[in-house]
């Protein structure tokens, strides 16, 4: 088992940072007027861990007895949609954005079924069920409108906990009907504290320089920090003392692969190279790397490699194609369009040609 899962806190009281927030959530969970929640913050800040701890606070250990089901829904055009549902007797966890623009169907049918069914466990502390919606900021506006109607109609039977990276894409009617809980990214000091506790539990030691290096290069993402720490340990599994070699921390395989895609685009700009890059992009998508993440990583890579004259063009193009990937179904088309655009403006700059207006 990964350290990330092995040492994940299970209760609000055992969380290592944002103590005031934990106390407030404990207080909320003890009342019968538990509200709908919108839990937001950057990746790796601890949103999901806190939501799982809230469920335990509401229902006790029974919320951890999970099963995974696959359910099929039918769209008005008779297209079949399949979605995985993680559930206990007390709650459901779904990611409707997995089905793209059909997420409205999931929201309408599933939430209606849950809201109209009674609580199965008669000994449960709360009479309502909780529905956890992951990546809520990726929901389409139609799905969010359906969600708003459900919140109004079935508020006695269900409570919604929405998890999002940002509130900017959540419509105002939902924001106004939820208690917004911001989970800020941990500070480097808090990340070092968590890593030190894990090392102590493992019977390991590490120099301060290594912990500082990880904490300062993990983008304040605790998940990434713990994975990096375990990666360092895996390179010398027999040693009780982790060694700081002073070398650059290893990047995840997918991130290294995206950099290889960027290098390939810098080396040659041609139709043949676009086809080669397209194949590499397919590999990333097939390994569940989100298209928006691919765009952001490519943009970050190019901004560090190319002339600053190109920066506004690339930023504008990345924003444009990110929007298109969210609106459409075939993300590979928009990724490939960004690749072609980059090759065009980069080749024009190399040849000394006048760049187009953006």
UniProtKB/Swiss-Prot annotation:
InterPro entries: DNA_pol3_clamp-load_cplx_C, DNA_Rep/Repair_Clamp_Loader, P-loop_NTPase
UniProt keyword annotations, A-Z: DNA replication, DNA-binding, Nucleus
GO biological process: DNA repair; DNA strand elongation involved in mitotic DNA replication; DNA-templated DNA replication; UV-damage excision repair
One of the record's GO cellular component terms: Ctf18 RFC-like complex
Pfam families: DNA_pol3_delta2, RCF1-5-like_lid, RFC_C
Main location: nucleus
Subcellular location as annotated: Nucleus
Sample GO molecular function, one term: DNA binding
Function: The elongation of primed DNA templates by DNA polymerase delta and epsilon requires the action of the accessory proteins PCNA and activator 1.
The family this protein is said to belong to: Belongs to the activator 1 small subunits family.
Subunit structure, as described in the record: Heteropentamer of subunits rfc1, rfc2, rfc3, rfc4 and rfc5 that forms a complex (RFC) with PCNA in the presence of ATP. Two other complexes exist where rfc1 can be replaced by either ctf18 or elg1 to form the ctf18-RFC or the elg1-RFC complexes respectively.
Designated name of the protein: Replication factor C subunit 5
């Amino acid at each position: 088992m990964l350290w990330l899962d092995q040492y994940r806190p299970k209760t609000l009281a055992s969380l290592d940072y944002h103590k005031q927030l934990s106390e407030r959530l404990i207080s909320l969970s003890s009342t019968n007027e538990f509200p709908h929640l919108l839990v937001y913050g950057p990746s790796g800040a601890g949103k999901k861990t806190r939501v799982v701890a809230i469920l335990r606070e509401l229902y006790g250990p029974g919320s951890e007895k999970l099963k995974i089901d696959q359910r099929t829904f039918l769209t008005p055009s008779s297209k079949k949609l399949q979605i995985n549902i993680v559930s206990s007797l007390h709650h459901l966890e779904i990611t409707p954005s997995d089905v793209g623009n059909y997420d409205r169907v999931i929201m309408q049918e599933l939430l209606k079924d849950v809201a109209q069914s009674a609580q199965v466990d008669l000994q449960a502390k709360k009479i309502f069920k909780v529905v956890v919606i992951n990546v809520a900021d990726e929901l389409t506006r139609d799905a969010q409108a359906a969600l708003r109607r459900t919140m109004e109609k079935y508020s006695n039977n269900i409570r919604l906990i929405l998890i999002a990276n940002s509130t900017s894409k959540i419509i105002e009617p939902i924001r106004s009907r939820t208690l917004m809980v911001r989970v800020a990214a941990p500070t480097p000091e808090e990340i070092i504290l968590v890593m030190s506790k894990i090392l102590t539990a493992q019977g390991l030691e590490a120099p301060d320089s290594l912990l500082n290096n990880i904490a300062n290069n993990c983008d304040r993402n605790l998940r990434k920090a713990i994975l990096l720490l375990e990666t360092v340990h895996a390179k010398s599994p027999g040693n009780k003392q982790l060694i700081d070699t002073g070398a650059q921390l290893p990047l995840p395989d997918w991130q290294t692969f995206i950099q290889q895609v960027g290098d390939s685009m810098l080396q040659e700009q041609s139709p043949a190279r676009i086809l080669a890059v397209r194949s590499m992009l397919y590999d990333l998508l097939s390994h569940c790397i989100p298209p928006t993440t691919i765009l952001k990583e490519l943009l970050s890579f190019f901004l560090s490699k190319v002339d600053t004259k190109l920066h506004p063009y690339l930023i504008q193009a990345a924003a444009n194609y990110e929007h298109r990937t969210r609106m459409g179904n075939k993300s590979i088309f928009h990724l490939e369009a960004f690749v072609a655009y980059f090759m065009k403006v980069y080749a024009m700059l190399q040849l000394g040609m006048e760049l187009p207006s953006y």
